[in-house]
Curated annotation (Swiss-Prot):
Localization of this protein: Cytoplasm
MF-aspect GO terms: leucyl-tRNA--protein transferase activity
Pfam annotation, one family: Leu_Phe_trans
Disulfide bonds: none
EC number: 2.3.2.6
Protein name (Swiss-Prot/TrEMBL): Leucyl/phenylalanyl-tRNA--protein transferase
Species this chain originates from: Neisseria meningitidis serogroup C (strain 053442)
Spans through the membrane: none
Described purpose of this protein according to its UniProt entry: Functions in the N-end rule pathway of protein degradation where it conjugates Leu, Phe and, less efficiently, Met from aminoacyl-tRNAs to the N-termini of proteins containing an N-terminal arginine or lysine.
InterPro entries: Acyl_CoA_acyltransferase, Leu/Phe-tRNA_Trfase, Leu/Phe-tRNA_Trfase_C, Leu/Phe-tRNA_Trfase_N
Keyword check for Cell cycle: no
């Protein structure tokens, strides 16, 4: 198996179809995590999965788990929490803090996090460029002061939102953020949410699998279409009681 070494002065990626067929999805390895390379990766259905000894490993996953916003499913227990909870969901209020919490979150069957400091710096750059966004669920503490309880972040290009990572400091906080974010993104024009991997967690929200070729074609069409309105920073996307 030959793994392509990505040139530092060229952000083009090899065909992910070859990587899926012969390299377990490993598209290539780079010595950088530049914002331009990240954006080109997402446009092609590729994402950085981890780093080792200063090298970044880029993968494609197929079939691809996605959510079509109008087919979002909210589990019954979560719907009850959305109706009765005392939460507030905001957008881009504390992006760096959300990424840091995602990096610190314990993951089943993982010794550490893939969100190393280099990843945090790279996504913060995308945030400054207007491509990376965080959704934050806030809950009141014992004193009544509202505090960050959970959330997630991802990358937006055109009418596609690429989900990256979640965290929860209180039960259901990340789920609340996601359930509020999907219709909000749909209202702005997002037509596809990339979940990257097929997980039970995303299946509960109605994720479905697309063959990678179909997924890549959807990206080709939707990445080129601008949103109706920029995501921006919002203090309240939705809130409970």
């Amino acid at each position: 198996m030959r793994i392509p070494l990505l040139a530092p002065d060229n952000y083009a990626f090899p065909d992910p179809a070859y990587a899926l067929a012969w390299c377990d999805g490993l598209v290539g390895v780079s010595g950088d995590l530049d914002a331009g390379r990240l954006l080109e990766a997402y446009r092609n259905g590729v994402f950085p999965w981890f780093s080792r000894d200063g090298w970044f490993f880029w993968y494609a996953v197929g079939p691809r788990a996605v959510i079509v916003p109008e087919r979002l499913h909210v589990p019954r227990s979560l719907a009850k929490t959305l109706r009765n909870g005392s939460y507030r969901v905001a957008v881009n209020g504390c992006f760096a803090e959300v990424v840091a919490h995602c990096a610190a979150a314990a993951r089943p069957n993982q010794d550490g996090t893939w969100i190393a400091p280099e990843f945090q710096t790279a996504y913060l750059k995308l945030h400054e460029m207007g491509h990376a966004h965080s959704f934050e669920c806030h809950y009141p503490d014992e004193s009544g002061e509202t505090r960050l309880a959970g959330g997630f972040y991802g990358v937006q290009i055109g009418r596609v939102f690429y989900g990256e990572s979640m965290f929860a400091l209180q039960p259901d906080a990340s789920k609340i953020a996601f359930a509020c974010a999907v219709p909000f993104l749909a209202d702005l024009g997002v037509e596809l949410i990339d979940c990257q991997q097929d997980t039970e967690h995303m299946r509960r929200f109605g994720s479905e699998l697309l063959p990678f070729a179909d997924f890549a074609e959807r990206l080709r069409m939707l990445n080129a279409v601008p949103l109706k309105e920029e995501i921006g920073r919002r203090e309240v996307v939705c809130k409970g009681l």
